[in-house]
């Protein structure tokens, strides 16, 4: 279920929506400048996806490239377990959940 009314974040959700079932995505969160509303035209989008299915690195890279092509913007795509431990708590505290499986 999409959890945002912010048009910027809806656009990100819509770019990922086609892959939710294919990859078993249970949650999508945005952090960084987009989450704070401080993005510039040059900003990338920082996205955390909880993926329920086992996928290889090439599938993950393909997912990232497909989202970038749809948004016409660079993204940084993370799974929660790949966030650096020393900043993970800070990232998760500021992250905005834009989709959560119900």
Task: Map each language-model feature to its residues.
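Catalytic core of pol beta-like nucleotidyltransferases
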Residues: 1-27, 36-41, 52-102
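Conserved histidines in hydrophobic membrane contexts and catalytic metal-binding motifs
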Residues: 30
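N-terminal beta1-alpha1 ligand-phosphate binding loop
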Residues: 33
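Short hydrophobic/aromatic beta-strand micro-patches
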Residues: 48-50
